[in-house]
Amino acid sequence: MISKPDKNKTRQKRHARVRGKISGTAECPRLNVYRSNKNIYAQVIDDVAGVTLVSASTLDSEVSGNTKTEQASSVGAVVAKRAVEKGIKEVVFDRGGYLYHGRVQALAEAARENGLDF
């Protein structure tokens, strides 16, 4: 019997490969994305200190939108505004092993439009 590969396990393997190559510092932190079935989360992380500097998710009251993609772009805008307020302009984008498409792409483009460089 042919079994399908577990999508989340392959994503985790892909994420581990990417994380081996990138890490965030205080000068250029890492913008991490996590996507669940209902929500999307974004964090700006300083890996040297092991501290989350800024975060946003669809659970925040500032986030609006009807579709999941609209909500993701709203999360990107909110996390970018919060990062710029803290003086963070340049980040390294960590897509979390997800394909750069759909909600992840919408979040990244909204973050770029609102002042983050990556």
From Swiss-Prot:
Keywords: Ribonucleoprotein, Ribosomal protein, RNA-binding, rRNA-binding
Gene3D superfamilies: 3.30.420.100
One biological process term in Gene Ontology: translation
Coiled-coil stretches noted in the UniProt entry, renumbered to this chain: none
Cellular component GO terms held in the UniProt record: cytosolic large ribosomal subunit
Function recorded in the entry: This is one of the proteins that bind and probably mediate the attachment of the 5S RNA into the large ribosomal subunit, where it forms part of the central protuberance.
Sequence similarity: Belongs to the universal ribosomal protein uL18 family.
Quaternary context: Part of the 50S ribosomal subunit; part of the 5S rRNA/L5/L18/L25 subcomplex. Contacts the 5S and 23S rRNAs.
Name of this protein: Large ribosomal subunit protein uL18
Classification lineage: Bacteria, Bacillati, Bacillota, Bacilli, Lactobacillales
